């Protein structure tokens, strides 16, 4: 705890007859180190952590002074931030479990007690990313999907159960419970923790990191938390502070109130668009102003959820009366809620705040209008009334159709001339093709038709206003006799069981089911690409006619090929609009002026005819939701169903690796582990494995979805007699490095400019010029002892906090990446794996420098080690001796990050320290 320098800041706090210790921020103000009223609330919370954990070793008095000295226009200072807990989801949690198991195995091989590898902060792993929508539209869809989920993931789930018994304070929320961020919001989040440290009770603010980029959703209840890669989360679990540069903090001042008919989803799409324009990457965002009181906590959580889409590290709302009311509504203990109030008031962390910010952004809630986002980025907001013009323009832009809606000459890839009018292999915009489904149903589909309509994702299923709104709209539609077209795959995947409970109590679940929105699972499903298969005849029609079909979902991401590889255009919308566009069956429609369908009397029905009013939604929520619901549903949150209880899992301190397993294999990271750190040196005679454009996502780098037998990962499984129907997804195979390294840079939509933008995981081997897969090329380079680099444009690694995007990069032999800019989590994950993230100088890039990607590359300036933000020199030399020289900056901001790189990664550093302590 706090060093002698700040021992006065450790004070006693009395509450209800109990005495607690606390790190009192007001003492720092009394000492003249800060003006608390001027510090953003998020910075105060960071400051409390630094103060409380200052031990004179990893966290010293200078760190406390640095955090206390935050000012809007002062250069960043490095501070070590220690979180109070960690949350994991299973796709990123399984590789974390595998890494922890591998660390124990490495310790055991060195003759060290393996239990030295032990989490030092509490951890919750929520299994939510594995359920897929194989069955839908029936009463038994949920049971069938869960049954298949266990069949596919039994081995992974056994490893998770092993971890639960092997590690202290490692809790597992079993399948079928909910989505990690909604469970976190409704139950796990405490706002303030009571913790025992060395026999004394302490009060500490709830802070966390999570292995999912949408962890900032917890900011809706005033908790500082953000997404990190599994690598960094594991380090935090093992007691490592997160060394970070104090961020700029952008204050968003909200005014006004949402107009009638506008939803929290519409609001978050507006804010996401706005903050992407402002530029908040690597920054904290705090919301304040009179408009905040007009938003429910669920609305706030919807906004906080999309922090990564906005570009920020966190988007938070400081705790106020509405926060405490939400804690009460969701079944938190009344005595704890009062403790939260008193502690936060004592720390100056409660109620309306107007501190000084790096930048202030004004946002008027009155200006929000019904909107969607698409076709492939969450910040591409489109007013609902503009969709009928948007979609034809999109198809022309992509070269799918020419002027007048006729098919363009070409293959639908965008290569055709936009003004071509001669019929090619495609389909005119206004024509349909007949398709006979497996059950004999005949449908017609064309460009713009909605094939997936999914009420999904914690972004929106955590918000009763939009869920009840969707239910009421479904009721009104059913009463009019409206139906969903047979070609639309409908699904409802609540983020917690409480949602189903209040929809049933409000008698709205039946109305949703009447339209086909049956519960398919309690997990992420379509939002993360687990939408399941489309009917084979529909997929065949898409391929045969180059159809640009669509999906509409209440999620937070719509990247290319994420929702389904056959669906080209994906749109984010509120749950009521998801139902509305499902009813319409197409996206090229103006629902403000065109009918959504016809009723039983043949009369045209418009969206406004079935849209529920705000007061009806509010009254339904009031009548249908109670604290007892939350208490009941979360009383057995760690127990699971009969399937989970019956699952036979390994026991013991060291995991028993199965060399025949295709799901869980010991990774190579800590095998033959040296106690000396390897350091870092110049890179010579490197080759570019890929050259990429802008906004290459972690989905592009490490896809999570299905893959075929023709790809390297599929070939590896086929060689081990795994049938194609048991391949499962990349995400489910993250405990197997053999599959994952073969899947790196293997997304079907990634475009490698070494092959003139050809889609898929292909590249050129130099100097032979042979086209091959990225994995096969990397293996040839490995045999030739050739180091590799990757070059890219802006926003490299945007998207999900996918540690395998960095692990796979490392295992392919890539020593450095060079991009114009990076998304924070991917950059940090690269550092966490010992890979150098380098940035071109302003105004430069591989294209601007005239690089082709077939050169030899030398990175110099590392002969004496690495310094934070070091400027390095790169020389690119062609086969005929011509050279291009340019400078890059190492995006390694702190001395601790340098240590990670020089040790080959953060876990390598942690293991090296643990082993050294035990062996010396």
Kindly give the residue locations of the regions a language model identified.
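Mobile "lid/hinge" segments at catalytic clefts and subdomain interfaces of large enzymes
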Residues: 199-341, 347-350, 466-469, 474-486, ...
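Long, structured ligand/cofactor-binding scaffold of large enzymes
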Residues: 55-257, 264-269, 370-373, 392-395, ...
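Segments forming glycine/polar-rich beta-alpha architectures that bind adenosine-containing cofactors
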Residues: 650-726
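Terminal amphipathic helices with adjacent charged low-complexity linkers/tails
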Residues: 82, 100-156, 292-417, 593-657, ...
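Acidic, glycine-rich flexible loop/linker segments
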Residues: 599-614, 826-900
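Acidic/polar, glycine-rich intrinsically disordered N-terminal extensions of enzymes
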Residues: 1-82, 96, 652, 663
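Extracellular/luminal Protease-associated
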Residues: 288-295, 556, 778-822
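NTP/phosphate- and nucleic-acid-binding module
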Residues: 724, 728-737, 741-771, 779-783, ...
């Amino acid at each position: 705890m706090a060093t002698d320098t700040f021992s006065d800041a450790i004070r006693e706090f009395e509450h209800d007859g109990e005495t607690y210790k606390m790190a009192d921020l007001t003492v720092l103000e009394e000492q003249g180190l800060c003006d608390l009223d001027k510090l953003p609330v998020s910075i105060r919370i960071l400051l409390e952590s630094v103060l409380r954990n200052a031990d004179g070793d990893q966290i010293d008095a200078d760190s406390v002074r640095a955090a206390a000295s935050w000012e809007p226009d002062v250069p960043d200072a490095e501070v070590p931030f220690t979180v109070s807990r960690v949350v994991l989801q299973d796709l990123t949690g399984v590789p974390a479990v595998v890494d922890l198991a591998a660390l124990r195995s490495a310790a055991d091989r060195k003759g060290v007690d393996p239990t030295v590898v032990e989490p030092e902060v509490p951890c919750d792993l929520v299994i939510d990313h594995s359920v897929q929508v194989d069955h839908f539209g029936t009463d038994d869809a949920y049971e069938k999907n869960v049954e298949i989920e266990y069949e596919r993931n039994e081995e992974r789930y056994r490893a998770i159960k092993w971890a639960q018994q092997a590690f202290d304070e490692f809790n597992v929320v079993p399948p079928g419970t909910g989505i990690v961020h909604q469970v976190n919001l409704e139950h796990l989040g405490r706002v303030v923790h009571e913790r025992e440290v060395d026999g004394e009770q302490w009060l500490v603010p709830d802070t966390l990191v999570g292995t999912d980029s949408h962890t900032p959703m917890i900011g809706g209840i005033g908790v500082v938390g953000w997404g990190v890669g599994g690598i960094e989360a594991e380090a935090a679990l093992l007691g490592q502070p997160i060394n970070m540069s104090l961020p700029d903090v952008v204050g968003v001042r909200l005014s006004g109130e949402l107009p009638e008919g506008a939803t929290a989803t519409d609001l978050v799409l507006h804010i996401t668009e706005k903050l992407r324009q402002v530029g908040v990457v690597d920054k904290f965002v705090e919301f304040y102003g009179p408009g905040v009181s007009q938003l429910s906590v669920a609305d706030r959580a919807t906004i906080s959820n999309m922090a990564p889409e906005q570009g920020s590290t966190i988007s938070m709302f400081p705790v106020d009366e509405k926060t405490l009311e939400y804690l009460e509504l969701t079944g938190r203990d009344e005595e704890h809620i009062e403790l939260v109030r008193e502690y936060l008031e004592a720390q100056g962390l409660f109620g309306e705040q107007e501190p000084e910010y790096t930048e202030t952004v004004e946002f008027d809630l009155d200006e929000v209008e019904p909107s969607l986002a698409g076709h492939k980025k969450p910040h591409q907001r489109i007013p609902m009334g503009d969709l009928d013009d948007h979609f034809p323009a999109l198809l022309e832009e992509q070269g799918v159709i020419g002027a007048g809606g006729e098919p363009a000459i070409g293959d639908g890839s965008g290569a055709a001339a936009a003004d071509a009018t001669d019929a090619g292999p495609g389909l005119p915009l206004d024509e349909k093709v007949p398709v006979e489904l497996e059950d004999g149903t005949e449908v017609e589909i064309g460009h713009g038709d909605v094939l997936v309509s999914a009420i999904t994702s914690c972004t929106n299923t955590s918000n009763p206003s939009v869920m009840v709104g969707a239910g009421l709209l479904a009721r009104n539609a059913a009463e009019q006799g409206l139906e969903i077209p047979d070609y639309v795959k409908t699904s409802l995947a609540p983020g917690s069981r409480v949602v189903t409970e209040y929809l049933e109590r409000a008698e709205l679940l039946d109305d949703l089911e009447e339209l086909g929105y049956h519960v398919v699972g309690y997990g992420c499903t379509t939002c993360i690409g687990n939408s399941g298969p489309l009917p084979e005849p529909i997929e065949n029609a898409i391929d045969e006619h180059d159809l640009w079909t669509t999906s509409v979902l209440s999620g937070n991401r719509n990247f290319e090929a994420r929702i389904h590889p056959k669906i080209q255009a994906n749109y984010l919308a509120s749950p009521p609009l998801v139902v509305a566009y499902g009813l319409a069956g197409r996206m090229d429609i103006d629902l403000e002026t065109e009918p959504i369908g016809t009723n039983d009397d043949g009369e045209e029905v418009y969206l406004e005819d079935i849209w529920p009013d705000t007061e009806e939604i509010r009254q339904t929520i009031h009548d249908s939701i109670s604290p007892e619901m939350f208490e009941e549903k979360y009383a057995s949150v760690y127990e699971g169903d009969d399937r989970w209880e019956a699952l036979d899992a390994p026991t013991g301190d060291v995991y028993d690796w199965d060399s025949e397993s295709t799901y869980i294999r010991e990774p190579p990271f800590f095998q033959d582990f040296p106690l000396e750190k390897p350091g870092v040196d110049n890179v010579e005679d490197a080759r570019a494995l890929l050259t990429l454009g802008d906004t290459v996502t972690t989905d592009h780098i490490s896809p999570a979805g299905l893959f075929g037998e023709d790809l390297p990962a599929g070939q590896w499984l086929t060689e081990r007699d795994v049938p194609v129907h048991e391949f499962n997804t990349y995400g489910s195979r993250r405990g197997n490095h053999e599959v994952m390294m073969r899947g790196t840079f293997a997304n079907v939509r990634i475009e490698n400019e070494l092959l003139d933008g050809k889609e898929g995981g292909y590249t050129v081997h130099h100097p032979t010029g042979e086209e091959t897969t990225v994995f096969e090329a990397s293996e040839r380079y490995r045999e030739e002892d050739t180091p590799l680099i990757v070059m890219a444009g802006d926003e490299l690694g945007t998207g999900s906090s996918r540690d395998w995007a960095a692990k796979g990069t490392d295992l392919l032999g890539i020593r450095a990446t060079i991009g114009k800019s990076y998304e924070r989590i991917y950059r940090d994950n690269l550092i966490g794996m010992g890979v150098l993230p380098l940035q071109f100088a302003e105004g430069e890039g591989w294209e601007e420098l005239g690089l082709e990607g077939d050169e030899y590359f030398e990175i110099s300036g590392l002969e004496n080690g690495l310094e934070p933000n070091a400027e390095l020199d790169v020389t690119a030399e062609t086969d005929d001796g011509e050279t291009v020289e340019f400078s890059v900056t190492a995006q390694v901001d702190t001395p601790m990050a340098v240590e990670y790189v020089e040790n080959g990664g953060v876990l390598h550093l942690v293991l090296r320290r643990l082993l050294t302590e035990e062996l010396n």
